[in-house]
Amino acid sequence: VGTLSASWQRDKAMSTTEDWIGKYPDLKAVICENDDMSMGALQAAEAEGKDLVIIGVDGISDALQAVKDGRLSASVLQDADGQASAVIDVAVKVGVGEEVESRYNVPFQLITADNVDDYLE
C-alpha cells in the first residue's frame, strides 16, 4: 500500500490506519516502527471490525498485553542491554588500541503469543 509517517504517535497511527482501511478494503497488515503506533493501528482496526496483522517495535507493556490477548500479532524488542554492551566493548578496545570490527550484530527479539509471557512483568 505505502508508507506514511505517524510521527511516533498513537493517535496519528490510528487516523492513518482508519484512512487506509477505508481506501484499501483488502488491507491485510500494518507494520509500525514503534509500539505506540502499533497500538493506534490496533485501535483503528478494532473500531472498524478489521482483523489485521499488526506488528510494532519496543515491547511496551500494553503492546505485550495485546500480544498475549491475541489482539496484536507481535512486537520486536530491541536488545538495549546488548547494544550497550557492544558499545562498551568497542570503546574499551579502541581505548587500548585494539582493532575493532566495522559492524556488530545485536539480535532483536520477536515477541509473539508463543513467548510473550517471558517478557511480561
Indicate residue ranges for each PLM-predicted region.
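A residue-level marker of the well-folded mature domains of exported/periplasmic proteins
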Residues: 1-121
